[in-house]
Design a protein with these regions (language model features):
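N-terminal "arm"/small-domain region of PLP-dependent enzymes with the aminotransferase-like
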Residues: 1-58
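Conserved core of the PLP fold type I
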Residues: 57-139
Length: 139
């Protein structure tokens, strides 16, 4: 039995990550476009990950409540106004799904993060772009 995929997927380009410095024949280059750090994680971070790994057999706090409380306290905010996710792409998907209805228009500047158009289309909304000028400002 074949699985029928949503037609909208035909309009969305396949993600192609940028080439690595090795693929380009570059030495001592840093690839910033993939949000990769050129430095190894600090020992304290490695230790925290190792400690957390001891609880991998348990579901985490789904709503990340304690982290939201801690961040809110640090910045003087109400925890209800703090959202934590697996990255900006994941958070963007959540926001678009929560806010947009079919046919809504979502305005954003171009050039921009490639995920904007994809997430807007997947939510059934219509992307509307506003190009930036040569100084990366709105006209």
């Amino acid at each position: 039995m074949a699985v029928k995929l949503r037609e909208i997927l035909e309009t969305i380009p396949v993600y192609r990550p940028g080439e690595s410095p090795d693929e380009c024949g570059l030495e001592n280059a840093v690839k910033l476009s993939s949000n990769e750090s050129p430095w190894e994680p600090p020992a304290s971070v490695v230790a925290a990950v190792q400690e957390a790994a001891l609880e991998l057999n348990r579901y985490p706090d789904y709503y990340k409540e304690q982290l939201c409380i801690d961040l809110a306290s640090c910045y003087g905010l109400d925890p209800a106004w703090v959202s934590v996710d697996n990255g900006s792409g994941s958070l963007l998907q959540d926001v678009v799904r929560i806010v947009c209805d079919d046919g809504d228009e979502v305005l954003y500047s171009t050039p921009t993060f490639a995920a904007y158009e994809i997430d807007v289309k997947l939510a059934g909304a219509k992307p509307v772009t506003c190009p930036l000028d040569d100084s990366y400002r709105y006209d």
